[in-house]
């Protein structure tokens, strides 16, 4: 319970299929950095997530690369090098919305929610 979850849509952070941050990402990342500075007491987890399009291994690799990009930006641009970051990719394994409808149709709105990066800040040791 002693955590803050920041969820940032991959659409804000990255172009389709990319792990290089877009300039539209910076204000969200600056606000995340402020929360980290104000609240973090312990490790900060950064987890990349994808939707179910593409192969499992591709999505795993992409989600890891995206999480690393966020960590690297926070360390370099927000000067958070004193904090310990645990970076991981979850691929398509932890959707927050269904990737398909009950009828088996594609669910673009659900998939959009699923490709994201989560920053989990521990607020007590």
Describe each model-derived feature in a short phrase.
Residues 49-125:
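Periplasmic OmpA-like peptidoglycan-binding domain that tethers envelope proteins to the cell wall
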Residues 29, 46, 87:
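Conserved hydrophobic/aromatic pocket- or pore-lining residues that grip, position, or stack substrates
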Residues 1-43, 123-125:
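Periplasmic peptidoglycan-binding/tethering modules of Gram-negative envelope proteins
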Residues 7, 24, 45-48, 52, ...:
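A generic structural signal for ordered alpha-helices
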